[in-house]
């Protein structure tokens, strides 16, 4: 679980993301689809899965909205993300291993967008947070 200090670091860092959230989401999602092409199977109905496409940008924004929701529920991720977990488990049927793949890509992009702010301490707190988010999203699979 996250320590009080890690929660504080995540909240403070997330506060810096602000207007860049949509770009971060689009870049991370596009990167995931490129680096891990097997993840494209969940989006087979989309006509354009290339980085920067309208669909990728739109879903990147959706992802970042979910992460912002998680930051808001940082003290109860399982409860706060229950509906997202249910959606991904029962309707979308996403393999929960993909949450960790997306988390990795988000970390890479956050480091690229905020090189001065993404210190080892921030990296550690954000990584733990994303692992907790992945676990909470996997809850309905159990």
From Swiss-Prot:
Transmembrane segments: none annotated. Residues 1-142 form the Globin domain. InterPro entries: Globin, Globin-like_sf, Globin/Proto, Hemoglobin_a-typ, Hemoglobin_oxygen_transport, Hemoglobin_pi. The modification N-acetylserine is found at residue 1. One of its GO terms (biological process) is hydrogen peroxide catabolic process. Heme b binds at residue 88. One of its GO terms (cellular component) is blood microparticle. Pfam families: Globin. The keyword NAD does not apply. SUPFAM superfamilies: Globin-like. GO terms for molecular function: haptoglobin binding; heme binding; iron ion binding; organic acid binding; oxygen binding; oxygen carrier activity; peroxidase activity. Keywords: Acetylation, Heme, Iron, Metal-binding, Oxygen transport, Transport. O2 binds at residue 59. Red blood cells. Heterotetramer of two alpha chains and two beta chains. Involved in oxygen transport from gills to the various peripheral tissues. PANTHER family: ALPHA GLOBIN-LIKE-RELATED (PTHR11442:SF93), HEMOGLOBIN FAMILY MEMBER (PTHR11442). Belongs to the globin family. This is Hemoglobin subunit alpha.
């Amino acid at each position: 679980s996250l320590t009080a200090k890690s929660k504080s670091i995540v909240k403070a860092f997330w506060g810096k993301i602000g207007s860049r959230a949509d770009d971060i989401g689009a870049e991370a999602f596009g990167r995931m689809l490129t680096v891990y092409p097997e993840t494209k199977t969940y989006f087979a109905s989309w006509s354009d899965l290339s980085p920067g496409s309208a669909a990728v940008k739109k879903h990147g924004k959706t992802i970042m909205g979910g992460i912002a929701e998680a930051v808001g529920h940082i003290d109860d991720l399982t409860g706060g993300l229950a509906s997202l977990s249910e959606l991904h488990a029962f309707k979308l049927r996403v393999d929960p291993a993909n949450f960790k793949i997306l988390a990795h890509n988000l970390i890479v992009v956050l480091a690229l967008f905020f090189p001065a702010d993404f210190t080892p301490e921030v990296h550690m707190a954000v990584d733990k947070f994303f692992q907790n988010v992945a676990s909470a999203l996997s809850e309905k699979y159990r």
